[in-house]
Regions:
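Short, conserved loop/helix-junction motifs that constitute active-site signature segments
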Residues: 83, 109-115, 139-140
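Short, glycine-/small-residue-rich phosphate/pyrophosphate-handling segment
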Residues: 119-158
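Hydrophobic packing residues within well-ordered alpha-helices of enzyme cores
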Residues: 104-107, 136
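Short, conserved acidic/polar surface loops in the N-terminal third of protein domains
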Residues: 101-102, 131
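N-terminal beta1-alpha1-beta2 submodule of the flavodoxin-like/Rossmannoid cofactor-binding fold
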Residues: 1-88, 98-99, 105, 161-173
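Glycine-rich, N-terminal phosphate-binding loop of Rossmann-like dinucleotide-binding domains
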Residues: 93-94
Length: 173
């Protein structure tokens, strides 16, 4: 088993993509994680909500805002039995209202990250990491949270070299 886990939340369907709405079959974050999987030996886990947000972008962002304000912890489709075997967790997600989607909080709060290294990666269209790194540190106080990597979602398919540099800097390549 790999000692690195790539845990990610990604959204397909209608997305804000390079200043326009566009339908995508695979979400930007999942695209980036596929590239990472080609670069390193890692297991992957897709964080999926039991009741997913709307496929319509504008409706989705309103649902996500409502969940954020309510500090909701959406139920997930599944969870890994354990993350004990992993030293490093690459946590990848889109920027939802300046932080992670609430489903990512559900995932993080389910496990003990004490002594683990978390590498945040956030896809976005200009809003960067937001306060997600701070939120991860608060949610996982025993973890070593390294500097995150913001990836422009509309450039997800062209992120290989950026990912390579980041993974090398974090000694995963």
């Amino acid at each position: 088993m790999a000692r690195t886990l790539i845990a990610f939340f990604s959204r397909a369907d209608e997305n804000y993509f390079g200043r326009a709405m566009r339908y995508v079959k695979v979400g930007n974050t999942e695209t980036v994680c596929g590239i990472m999987k080609d670069l390193i030996d890692a297991d992957t886990f897709k964080i999926e909500m039991k009741d997913p947000y709307s496929p319509v972008y504008m409706t989705c962002i309103e649902e996500a805002k409502k969940d954020l304000r309510a500090k909701a912890r959406p139920e997930l489709v599944s969870m890994p039995d354990s993350i004990d075997a992993y030293d490093t967790v690459i946590l990848a997600y889109p920027n939802y209202w300046g932080t992670m989607p609430m489903a990512v909080f559900t995932f993080l709060e389910h496990y003990d990250f004490n002594g683990k290294t978390i590498l945040p990666l956030c896809t976005n269209e200009g809003s960067g990491m937001g306060k997600s790194e701070r939120d991860i540190k608060k949610t996982c106080p025993g973890a070593v949270v390294k500097g995150g990597l913001p990836i422009t979602g509309s450039m997800a398919g062209e992120s290989r070299e950026t990912l390579k540099r980041w993974l090398k800097a974090n000694r995963l390549i």
